């Protein structure tokens, strides 16, 4: 119940953060920031 939902939310948030970090890193590498 609660614990599983918290875990899902955490995974979702972590995924979003990781994605934006990767996007930022790749735009820095390609010099398009």
From Swiss-Prot:
Its main location: secreted. Disulfide bonds join 27-33. One of its GO terms (biological process) is defense response to bacterium. InterPro entries: Antimicrobial_frog_2. One of its GO terms (cellular component) is extracellular region. Keywords: Amphibian defense peptide, Antibiotic, Antimicrobial, Disulfide bond, Secreted. Expressed by the skin glands. It holds the Pfam family Antimicrobial_2. It is found in: Secreted. Belongs to the frog skin active peptide (FSAP) family. Brevinin subfamily. Antimicrobial peptide active against E.coli (MIC=5 uM), K.pneumoniae (MIC=10 uM), B.cereus (MIC=7 uM) and S.aureus (MIC=12 uM). Has very little hemolytic activity. This is Cyanophlyctin-beta.
């Amino acid at each position: 119940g609660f614990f599983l939902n918290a875990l899902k939310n955490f995974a979702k948030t972590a995924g979003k953060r990781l994605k934006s970090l990767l996007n930022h890193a790749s735009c820095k590498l390609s010099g398009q920031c």
